[in-house]
């Protein structure tokens, strides 16, 4: 196979050195140099169906024409820009909550928007969405449907998998969750010694942890405060140890969340929790028989393993192979959420997601929030070469949202092979990072404002706070609005000069020395997402919006967004290394680095 570089032609006439914008030809199509220089290792067998689209060629031309145009010029030319490049979706709630997207602070104009919408059409996005909603096996590498939408199908319309309506089974599990969660919340469910449950410990990892953690944190104002929730995910013994120190084990319910009930991290932690319970009872001379069934429930599909663990089958909550881990918070995996906020609020969470499902399936493309969000992202990733995307929630309750969206986006679209089995010919999923509110401003916003990488941002805020304390929320939201504006408009050298002179600086030398440091070039893009208030319904809408954004981007790139083979290799190697971690043992069957690290561990770990 020839090297990818052998197939490239750098247009030196338009290189950065000559003041133009470099491009590289793959076949007959020119891709921006800043994009292709990152695609090392992509060979002649690359999948070029995306880059062969007429709309892709048009977008490349539009990038060359408008890519350097300051965003603020669009606002100067159009006083209604903010209104024209925004969409409001009613969530259908009594409190008149809504989801509002403003994408006007982007390098977008009508021509670019039309070309992006044509790209979605050329890539068959509407047809793909219909395939997903019909229950077709769109997860091709695992031959599975992708039907988390069925879990929040509040219309209760039939949804079929292999000719069978899944809604009766979905509703049955939801009713089972309702009955059990109400027993825990009311104190009817007792531990082995007769104490009511006051602590709930969820043991899971990945999708079995990130979604429940994020949602219970986000919806704390709706929680039952005399129940404390804890989450154990890391196989580092410190995680389970610290949680066990903080609870009354006689009043604790452990939720073991593992579809197969064989996940190494989860089962290791669950066994340690079971050992802690049994050791506690034995140390006090209490008969341990039947105790595990009183203190453990399972979110799993493996009946046999659950029974072997000691959990009553009646307390096993099922879900299905068409529910992917990172899309599972709507399923039985959401049991800790329901225990925390109650059945009615959990249904509100599902309803918010369902509203966006309906919007996504039926709204016209030019008003379709997940579609627009995805297309703006593709524009920046594939034409501006953006490799990171910041999630910036201005609501402390959403502090775990960036971590949740890291898995959702990066595990879904962090791939370099298309559904055809060929390598991609473009960049795919970005690095997702973020932090809540003004904390991020004092950590990494410096790089977003003045760094050398273009980092598109999503600012997420609520108009009404759940905690009305003095002027806190006004101060908070003034920063929210200011940051989106500052990133876009920047600050020119002349503005800096006037500011320094107004502050009393008279030395031209000092002013000239400070000018480059205090200048902001601006043109840093952002989306603004506003809700009226952070309710269960609003949270459901936000999460569903991002799920569908990921779907659209994956479909445009031609990758399978619903498998995660990249998670497996390290796990396999870890299983072979585990028996080698023994005091005094020397290994030499790895590379010299890994051999040395293992040998150092074996030499010192037992001391």
UniProtKB/Swiss-Prot annotation:
It catalyses: alpha-D-glucose 6-phosphate = beta-D-fructose 6-phosphate. GO terms for cellular component: cytosol; glycosome. Pathway: Carbohydrate degradation; glycolysis; D-glyceraldehyde 3-phosphate and glycerone phosphate from D-glucose: step 2/4. Its main location: other. One of its GO terms (molecular function) is carbohydrate derivative binding. It is an enzyme of class 5 (isomerase). The active site is at 411 (proton donor), 442, 571. InterPro entries: G6P_Isomerase, G6P_Isomerase_C, Phosphoglucose_isomerase_CS, SIS_dom_sf, SIS_PGI_1, SIS_PGI_2. It is found in: Glycosome. It comes from the Eukaryota. Keywords: Gluconeogenesis, Glycolysis, Glycosome, Isomerase, Peroxisome. Pfam families: PGI. Its EC number is 5.3.1.9. A motif (Microbody targeting signal) lies at residues 605-607. One of its GO terms (biological process) is glucose 6-phosphate metabolic process. HAMAP family: G6P_isomerase. NCBIfam families: PRK00179.1. Belongs to the GPI family. Homodimer. This is Glucose-6-phosphate isomerase, glycosomal. The gene is PGI.
């Amino acid at each position: 196979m020839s090297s990818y570089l052998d197939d490239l032609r750098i247009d030196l006439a338009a290189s950065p050195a000559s003041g133009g914008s470099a491009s590289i030809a793959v076949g007959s199509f020119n891709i921006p140099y800043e994009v292709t220089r990152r695609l090392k290792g992509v060979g002649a067998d690359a999948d070029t169906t995306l880059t062969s689209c007429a709309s892709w060629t048009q977008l490349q031309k539009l990038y060359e024409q408008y890519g350097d145009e300051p965003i603020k010029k669009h606002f100067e030319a159009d006083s209604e820009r903010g209104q024209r490049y925004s969409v409001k979706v009613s969530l259908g709630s009594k409190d008149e909550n809504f989801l509002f997207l403003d994408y006007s602070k982007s390098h977008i104009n009508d021509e670019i928007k039309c070309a992006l919408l044509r790209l979605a059409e050329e890539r068959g996005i509407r047809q793909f969405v219909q395939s997903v909603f019909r229950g077709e096996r769109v997860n091709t590498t695992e031959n599975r449907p992708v039907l988390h939408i069925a879990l929040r199908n509040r219309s209760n319309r039939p949804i079929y998998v292999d000719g069978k309506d899944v809604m009766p089974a979905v509703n049955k599990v939801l009713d089972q969750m309702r009955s059990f969660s109400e027993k825990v919340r009311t104190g009817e469910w007792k531990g082995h010694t007769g104490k009511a449950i006051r602590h709930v410990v969820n043991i899971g990892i990945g999708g079995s942890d990130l979604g429940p953690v994020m949602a219970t944190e986000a919806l704390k104002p709706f929680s039952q405060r005399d129940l404390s929730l804890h989450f154990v995910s890391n196989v580092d013994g410190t995680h389970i140890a610290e949680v066990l120190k903080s609870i009354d084990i006689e009043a604790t319910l452990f939720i073991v969340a593992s579809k197969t009930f064989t996940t190494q991290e989860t089962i290791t932690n669950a066994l340690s929790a079971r050992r802690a319970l049994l050791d506690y009872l034995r140390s006090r001379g209490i008969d341990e028989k039947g105790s595990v069934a009183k203190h453990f429930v399972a979110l799993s599909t493996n009946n046999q393993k659950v029974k072997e663990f000691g959990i009553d089958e009646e307390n096993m909550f099922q879900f299905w192979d068409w529910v992917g881990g990172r899309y599972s918070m709507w399923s039985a995996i959401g049991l800790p959420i329901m225990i925390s906020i109650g059945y009615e609020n959990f249904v509100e969470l599902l309803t918010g997601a369902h509203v966006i499902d309906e919007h996504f399936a039926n709204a016209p493309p030019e008003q379709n929030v997940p579609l627009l969000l995805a297309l703006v992202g593709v524009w920046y990733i594939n034409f501006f070469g953006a490799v990171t995307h910041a999630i910036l929630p201005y609501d402390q309750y959403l502090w775990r949202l960036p971590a949740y969206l890291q898995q959702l986006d990066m595990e879904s679209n962090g791939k370099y092979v298309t559904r055809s089995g060929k390598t991609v010919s473009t960049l795919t999923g970005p690095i997702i990072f973020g932090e809540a509110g003004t904390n991020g401003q004092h950590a990494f916003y410096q790089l977003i404002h003045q760094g050398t990488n273009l980092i598109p941002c999503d600012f997420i805020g609520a108009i009404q706070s759940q905690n009305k304390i003095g002027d806190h929320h006004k101060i908070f939201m003034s920063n929210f609005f200011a940051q989106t504006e500052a990133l876009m408009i920047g600050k020119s050298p002349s503005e800096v000069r006037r500011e320094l002179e107004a502050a009393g600086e008279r030395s031209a030398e000092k002013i000239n020395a400070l000018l480059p440091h205090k200048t902001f070039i601006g043109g840093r893009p952002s989306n603004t997402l506003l809700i009226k208030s952070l309710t269960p319904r609003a949270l459901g809408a936000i999460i569903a919006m991002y799920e569908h954004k990921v779907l659209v981007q994956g479909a445009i790139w031609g990758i399978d967004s619903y498998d995660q083979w990249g998670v497996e290799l390290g796990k396999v190697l870890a299983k072979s290394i585990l028996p080698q971690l023994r005091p005094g043992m020397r290994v030499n069957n790895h590379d010299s680095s890994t051999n040395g690290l293992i040998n150092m561990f074996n030499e010192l770990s037992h001391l």
